[in-house]
């Protein structure tokens, strides 16, 4: 029987990661956050002193990288760069822009494509990102496009950072969010857009539990789980 694959796409701060992780846990699926993979490439460039928009230098460093995505006993995803667990380091605010810029480089996307697709070949998976339903898993059994107003997404990101002990002014978080929205939707390589057959879900007025319930309902309905 062919494994079930579910694609959850959407802009930064829409709740993709937390909702996808919770849903994967609910149904016993593997969870893959592709954004964390791009953040790991961004972190590698940042640590090497490479400008985020220096595509040539970013491409040149790719053969040197050893990136691993592992799942712990708790099912949580951990990212490793050259053997180091960088799962927390990639969440630094300054890495967000790096991740957005390097993900716009076609060579970076091609470099990471096989890693992403390999997870869906032998196991049930919920994968979230920006081009999962359109490029990475175009044949996914269910495609969901999560969105919310940019203000709501910026507020969520600010609260998320505060929980990690990182306080940033709302205006700064909002500017970063608007920058990423523009960058992600206008890039030439796999721009952010809903797949034609994606179910669109606006979570602006929904809290976390309500958003999870809506996604889980879609999964149950589609796959009779």
Task: Give residue ranges: language-model regions.
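Hydrophobic anchor at the beta1->P-loop junction of P-loop NTPases
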Residues: 8
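The conserved Walker
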Residues: 12
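Conserved lysine of the Walker
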Residues: 16
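Hydrophobic positions on the alpha1 helix immediately C-terminal to the Walker A/P-loop
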Residues: 19
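N-terminal phosphate/diphosphate-binding loop that engages ATP/GTP or pyrophosphate donors
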Residues: 25-92
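Small-molecule kinase domains that catalyze NTP-dependent phosphoryl transfer to phosphate-bearing small molecules
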Residues: 71, 116-123, 130-135, 139, ...
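ATP-dependent NMP and nucleoside kinases share a basic, alpha-helical "lid"
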Residues: 87-164
